[in-house]
């Protein structure tokens, strides 16, 4: 027997069975697709889900095993590796010559005798006075010397007398530390030759030899206690259900207007306020003007421009620079002689002439030839008149009234709105059977005659 519940009988998506929260007393394999989300957000039959942008699995992997040879193994072969030859340094040989203790200063320094420099400042008075000046300074006139004995000097007497012989430039360090030749030491460093050992490596270690295996104890597995359901029946009563009782009220009335409006039978007026106030003006018919046929000139086209006709090549010389010559300030030589001036004489300062580029462009005396590539290869052609594919103008539009009919008004067929069978207290054509463990109110279909009569009920039946 095909039984249906309110969820299956509803055609508007607003009615469903009062589902219970849990079902622990009945074990059924039939899944229940009802949830809080499907209750609040019903599915729309007119909505089509969009296509997935996930790429399709068009590529199929070949079952042939992959070759172990790579590009590097195929293109690059093996080479015979030769051991690296290490360079052995040469033995150091001591120099037999004696070391000279001359410094860079003694080698490059040249002694120059010093001469007295003549005074640079001229004398104030050219005529010298030979008379002696007789005057006493203020210090000598005011301060007279005391008659005291001169104190003896505390400075020790100078007992050092420099030797008359020549200084031999020997130091204490040179006397105490003589020069020693380098000693050849024997190197105990092993040579860098490769050591190739053919003896295989022993895998036996001290850990393997001294390890003693002990038997493992069996692990104790704890079994979990089996679930025992409570004998007290579940009343499914919550604080919310206990405090707030639902009252049976009248069904909500729909505010949707009736589809058959009385004003839809009147034809739509095509005349508007704009058409009544602004009438079309009588415009005269436009006569198209005949185009004048193009007549090409008989002579050839003169390609000579105004610049080519009037320009003449001037055979002139480029202009010279008007920049004044910079005069160097020359002064008299300084009348003095120093060691630096005697060693470093003045250089002959000669003025360098400016570097002028050579004129590479040479203007010819012959007149300019105005023959170009366009003139040499240009062939005049007659212009081709293209045919216009633009449709002809049919004149001003005639005032034709607008048709009030549309495609929707001609092809629309009104249909009868049927009431949802789940909105009745008892669905017509079905008899209540039972309520299952989940909370679905199951109905079985009645006889065929009763179901046919109930299907023809209109929208106004209550």
UniProtKB/Swiss-Prot annotation:
Per the record, which residues fall in region Mn 9?
300-332
Q: Region Mn 1: what ranges?
A: 30-64
What biological-process terms (Gene Ontology) are attached? Answer: cell projection organization; cellular response to cold; cold acclimation; positive regulation of cilium assembly; protein stabilization
The similarity comment for this entry is:
Belongs to the FAM154 family.
The segments labelled Mn 3 in the record are 98-131
Spell out the protein name for this chain.
Answer: Stabilizer of axonemal microtubules 1
Superkingdom of origin organism = Eukaryota
* Gene Ontology cellular component terms for the protein in this record: axonemal microtubule; centriole; centrosome; ciliary basal body; cytoskeleton; motile cilium; sperm flagellum
State the domain notes: The Mn regions are involved in microtubule-binding and stabilization at low temperature. They are required and sufficient for cilium targeting. The N-terminal region (residues 1-29) might play a role in centriole retention.
Task: Note down the stretches annotated as region Mn 12.
Answer: 367-400, 401-434
Q: Where is this region: Mn 5?
A: 166-199
- Return the annotated region ranges for Mn 2: 65-97
What InterPro entries does the record point to? SAXO1/2 (IPR033336)
Keyword annotations of the record: Cell projection, Cilium biogenesis/degradation, Cytoplasm, Cytoskeleton, Repeat
Localization recorded for this chain is: Cytoplasm, Cytoskeleton, Microtubule organizing center, Centrosome, Centriole; Cytoplasm, Cytoskeleton, Cilium basal body; Cytoplasm, Cytoskeleton, Cilium axoneme; Cytoplasm, Cytoskeleton, Microtubule organizing center, Centrosome
Oligomeric state and partners?
Associates with microtubules via the Mn regions.
Q: What does this protein do?
A: May play a role in the regulation of cilium length. Stabilizes microtubules at low temperature.
An annotated Gene Ontology molecular function = microtubule binding
> Which stretches does the entry tag as region Mn 10?
333-366
Q: Where is this region: Mn 8?
A: 267-299
Q: Where is the segment annotated Mn 6?
A: 200-232
Tell me the segments the record calls region Mn 4. 132-165
Q: Where is this region: Mn 7?
A: 233-266
């Amino acid at each position: 027997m095909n039984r249906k519940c309110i969820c299956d009988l509803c055609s508007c998506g607003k009615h469903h069975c009062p589902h219970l929260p849990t079902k622990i007393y009945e074990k059924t394999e039939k899944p229940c697709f009802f949830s809080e989300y499907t209750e609040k957000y019903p599915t729309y039959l007119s909505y089509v889900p969009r296509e997935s942008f996930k790429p399709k699995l068009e590529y199929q992997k070949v079952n042939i095993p992959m070759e172990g040879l790579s590009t590097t193994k195929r293109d690059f072969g093996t080479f015979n590796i030769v051991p690296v030859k290490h360079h052995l340094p040469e033995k150091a040989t001591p120099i037999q010559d004696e070391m000279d203790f001359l410094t860079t200063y003694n080698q490059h320094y040249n002694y120059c005798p010093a001469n007295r420099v003549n005074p640079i400042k001229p004398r104030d008075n050219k005529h010298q006075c030979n008379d002696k000046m007789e005057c006493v300074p203020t210090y000598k006139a005011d301060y007279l010397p005391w008659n005291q004995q001169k104190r003896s000097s505390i400075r020790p007497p100078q007992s050092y007398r420099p030797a008359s012989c020549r200084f031999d430039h020997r130091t204490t360090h040179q006397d105490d530390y003589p020069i020693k030749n380098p000693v050849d030491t024997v190197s105990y460093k092993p040579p860098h030759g490769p050591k190739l050992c053919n003896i295989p490596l022993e895998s036996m270690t001290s850990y393997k030899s001294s390890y003693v295996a002990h038997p493992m104890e069996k692990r104790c597995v704890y079994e979990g206690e089996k679930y025992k359901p409570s004998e007290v029946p579940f009343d499914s009563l919550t604080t919310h259900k206990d405090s707030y009782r639902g009252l049976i009220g009248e069904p909500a009335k729909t505010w949707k207007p009736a589809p058959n409006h009385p004003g839809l039978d009147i034809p739509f007026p095509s005349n508007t306020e704009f058409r009544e106030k602004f009438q079309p003006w009588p415009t005269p018919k436009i006569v198209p003007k005949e185009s004048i046929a193009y007549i090409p000139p008989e002579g050839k086209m003169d390609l000579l421009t105004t610049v080519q006709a009037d320009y003449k090549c001037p055979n002139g010389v480029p202009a010279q620079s008007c920049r004044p010559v910079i005069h160097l300030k020359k002064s008299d030589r300084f009348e003095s002689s120093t060691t630096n001036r005697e060693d470093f004489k003045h250089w002959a300062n000669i003025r360098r002439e400016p570097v002028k580029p050579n004129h590479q462009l040479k203007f010819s005396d012959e007149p300019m030839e105005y023959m170009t590539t366009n003139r040499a290869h240009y062939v005049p052609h007659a212009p081709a008149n293209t045919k216009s594919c633009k449709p002809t103008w049919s004149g001003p539009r005639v005032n034709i009234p607008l048709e009030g009919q549309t495609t929707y008004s001609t092809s629309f067929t009104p249909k009868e709105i049927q009431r949802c069978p789940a909105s009745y207290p008892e669905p017509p054509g079905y008899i209540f059977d039972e309520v299952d463990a989940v909370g679905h109110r199951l109905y079985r279909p009645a006889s065929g005659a009763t179901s046919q009569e109930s299907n023809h009920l209109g929208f106004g039946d209550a």
